[in-house]
Amino acid sequence: KGTNAEILSDKLNIPTISTGNILRAAVKDGTPMGLKAKSFMDAGALVPDEVILGIIKERLTASDCANGFILDGVPRTIAQAEALEQLGIEIDKVVNLLVEDSTIEARMAGRRVCAKCGASYHIKNKPSKVEGVCDRCGGELVIRKDDRPETVRDRLVTYHQQTEPLVDFYRKRGKLVDIPDQGSIEATNAYILKQLEA
């Protein structure tokens, strides 16, 4: 989802607001909020709503969000979705990527992230030019703790329990756009754009 969000962001010229990236930066910087979030992230659990929503609201006031934005990683619960509505944060469309759990596990196992700048790669689908080295800054590519198989399985259980109910929440509001897996990032992204323009 993050890779598709980045591509859409470039094509639509609007920022992707990734809660994961914002939280990881806070953890790396050792901010009080980052330290609070770290224990949840390391366990593959969801970070409390008040932490997530505070970060999101602050970020959406930036000038680059004036013409729109893509939220990646929020909302993850009905409570977060309702809180976003109460904060006056308007969500026009919700993209629902229809991907099997086994495919997600395989994709996450191949993900690598730059330890310096946070750029994301995949050993098969989006490799760096030099194995293990970031194309952007030359930093080392690493496997994040939350991409390890046992953590991915825990995250999927959490998704099915807490996030999957959002499908009906947004479908009832006429905002849900279901996107079947198209087999490649490029094909999926083209399909998403076509559906958003419909």
Question: Language-model segments: which ranges?
Answer:
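Glycine-rich phosphate-binding loop of ATP-dependent small-molecule kinases
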Residues: K1-A198
